[in-house]
UniProtKB/Swiss-Prot annotation:
Database matches in Pfam families: DEAD, Helicase_C
Organism encoding this protein: Scheffersomyces stipitis (strain ATCC 58785 / CBS 6054 / NBRC 10063 / NRRL Y-11545) (Yeast)
Catalytic activity: ATP + H2O = ADP + phosphate + H(+)
GO biological process, alphabetically ordered: maturation of 5.8S rRNA from tricistronic rRNA transcript (SSU-rRNA, 5.8S rRNA, LSU-rRNA); maturation of LSU-rRNA from tricistronic rRNA transcript (SSU-rRNA, 5.8S rRNA, LSU-rRNA)
A GO term for molecular function: ATP hydrolysis activity
Top-level division of the source organism's lineage: Eukaryota
SMART domains named in the record: DEXDc (SM00487), HELICc (SM00490)
Cited Gene3D superfamilies: P-loop containing nucleotide triphosphate hydrolases
Task performed by this protein: ATP-binding RNA helicase involved in the biogenesis of 60S ribosomal subunits and is required for the normal formation of 25S and 5.8S rRNAs.
Protein name: ATP-dependent RNA helicase DBP6
């Protein structure tokens, strides 16, 4: 086949034959195809003629059997005539559309800024409400429940069981104070309603001055709610920041639950966590009093089951929320919110009770507790809400004693002489800034009173002698006046609950409004009268004291300034005694 391309004779003969064949084919086609079809396929035939001319090329010997091909093409066209008719009609329309689009493209395009196009508002299904929507609602912070500090009411007027009234009277509790009235009215109503409606009752946050009776405010309703229980399970947990508070709270629950089968347990760090966990598993208590760290350890070891918990009390909440030991808050709350199949087990939502004398309203801190339907109760005459709520007892009288910086060198002597001149020789609590300062002041006062008033007994308490046995003995001796003056630090300020304290003296200024409130709150407890004195030496200390007391609520009362004439208070003989005591103290320290 390819050899024919290079044979001139073959090329000439083939070209002549192809011309004759093409003429015969055209004649045959005219006879076969009718006139109507011929008109419709003129364009197709013209293309075929061009193909036949191309076949005359001497170099192209590929097209043989042209007769067969032509017959196939004619049959193809005849068969799909309707398709070709539609094609012919669409060609002019396509040209028209192309011309219109080209003219539109030539039109000027309007320039637009580079900005997002406006979008329609997304539809909202108001029927779908988040189950956590209450966490975002902080209206309860702006609408607290205020209670007057002067309110009082006999316990016999509350709807509580006879055994509770009997136990209260045995401990000489006959009248409820303001915070107890406010909280008991709410909790007792919730408890009564919950017996028929086991729904979420709502959490309670309480801001009341230290010493106002917060422990009784939550312990009485808890005992009332649990005393008829049948199966012992962990139903109430009370969290406090220190060991002394654990002992005090536990003692209150034990006294109030006399005559019932309720079991009260305190978690202690001086006992093996494993042994303590085994006891709890074998004999579940009804009420647990603990520090957050110890409780988290038991939760991690799964020795405490929280499925039956009804009450979670956080006492001294401001201090506990500032602690991040073992991330206790997140661990505890996540354990309470564990997934439970309610088809198989009914889980009660525990009611959270938050108490503090310096309650924070910082939503960032409070949100970690994940409140449900919270209510804020403030025991204060001043109906004002600030970021930190600080209140002192209404029965407290506050004083400030100010001197120039030059007199700071005889500060211990001024204190000793003022106590002697004003007959404040017992039930006096003095606060210093550090362990070293408390020990030094205690020793110096012992030496001075040994020469000025020999019958005085002075002691100190701080983190260096804060073991349970030593601490218990010191506080007991102080409450029975075997110790006349006690020098302490801020670290243990919240653990002292002695009703007999009449005077608190801030020998060193507190670091914040919160510490000031907790210091002076050691007196004027349970609506008894009390006095707080603050020593300021120099303009700097006076300015700082003015700043920290500006945020403290005290009703209509003000801080009185005590005017003292040093020439009348201190004589030359007193200064000689003071210098001798300083020399004696230095010998004790360095020898």
């Amino acid at each position: 086949m390819f050899g024919a391309r290079f044979d001139p004779t073959a090329d000439d003969s083939s070209s002549d034959e192809s011309e004759e064949e093409s003429e015969e084919e055209e004649n045959e086609n005219e006879n076969v195809v009718n006139n109507d079809v011929a008109k419709d396929i003129d364009s197709v035939e013209s293309e075929e003629s061009e193909d036949s001319d191309h076949s005359n090329d001497p170099n192209d010997a590929m097209d043989v059997d042209s007769e067969v091909n032509t017959e196939v093409d004619v049959d193809y066209v005849s068969k799909y005539k309707s398709v070709f008719d539609k094609f012919k009609k669409s060609v002019p329309e396509t040209k028209k559309i192309d011309s219109e689009s080209s003219s539109e493209e030539e039109d000027d395009v309007e320039m637009q800024d580079l900005m997002p196009l406006p979008q329609p508002a997304l539809p909202r299904d108001k029927r779908l409400i988040s189950s956590n929507s209450h966490l975002k609602n902080l209206d309860w912070l702006a609408t607290p429940i205020y209670a007057s500090p002067e309110d009082s009411k006999p316990f016999s007027e509350f709807e509580i069981s006879p055994f509770l009234l009997k136990n209260l009277e045995r401990d000489n509790f006959t009248t409820a104070f303001s915070v107890q009235i406010a909280i008991m009215d709410i909790l007792l109503h919730d408890i009564k309603r919950n017996r028929l409606e086991p729904d979420v009752k709502g959490d309670i946050l309480v801001n009341a001055a230290t010493g106002s009776g917060k422990t009784l405010a939550y312990s009485i309703p808890i005992i009332e709610a649990l005393h008829n229980r049948v199966v012992p399970r962990v139903r109430a947990i009370v969290l406090v920041p220190t060991k002394p508070l654990i002992n005090q709270v536990k003692a209150t629950f034990v006294q109030l639950s006399r005559g019932t089968n309720l079991s009260v347990v305190s978690l202690r760090n001086d006992v093996s966590i494993k042994e303590e966990g085994i006891k709890i598993v074998n004999s579940p208590p009804d009420i647990i009093v603990s520090t957050p760290g110890r409780l988290v350890e038991h939760i991690s070891n799964k020795s405490i089951n929280l499925n039956s918990l009804q009450f979670l009390v956080i006492d001294e909440a401001d201090r506990l929320l500032n602690q991040s030991f073992q991330n206790w808050c997140q661990v505890l709350i996540s354990s309470l919110e564990g997934d439970v199949n309610i088809a198989e087990e009914w889980k009660i939502t525990p009611q959270k009770l938050i108490f503090s004398a310096t309650l924070t309203t910082d939503s960032g801190k409070l949100s970690a507790l994940k409140f449900q339907k919270p209510r804020l109760v403030i025991v204060n005459d001043r109906k004002q809400l600030v970021n930190e709520i600080f209140n002192v007892p209404s029965s407290l009288s506050e004083y400030t004693i100010q001197f120039g910086t030059a007199k700071a060198s005889i500060k211990p002597l001024i204190l000793a002489k003022y106590l002697l001149e004003n007959n404040k020789l017992s039930n006096v609590l003095i606060f210093t800034k550090s362990n070293e300062a408390s020990i030094r002041l205690c020793k110096l006062l012992e030496l001075m009173f040994g020469k000025l008033h020999p019958s005085m007994n002075i002691a100190y308490i701080n983190s260096t002698n804060n073991k349970s046995a030593i601490r218990t003995k010191i506080l007991k001796d102080f409450s029975t006046q075997k110790i006349n003056i006690l020098v302490a630090t801020d670290l243990i300020a919240r653990g002292i609950d002695i009703l007999s304290i009449t005077d608190v003296i801030n020998y060193d200024l507190p670091n914040s409004s919160r510490e000031y409130v907790h210091r002076v709150g050691r007196t004027a407890r349970a609506n008894q009268t009390g006095h707080a004195y603050t020593l300021c030496f120099g303009k700097g200390e006076a300015k700082w004291f003015k700043k920290i007391i500006s945020d403290v609520g005290r009703g209509d009362k003000t801080i009185e300034k005590v005017e003292i004439e040093l020439k009348e208070l201190i004589v030359a003989e007193d200064e000689n005694v003071y210098n001798e005591c300083l020399e004696s103290l230095s010998k004790q320290v360095f020898h």
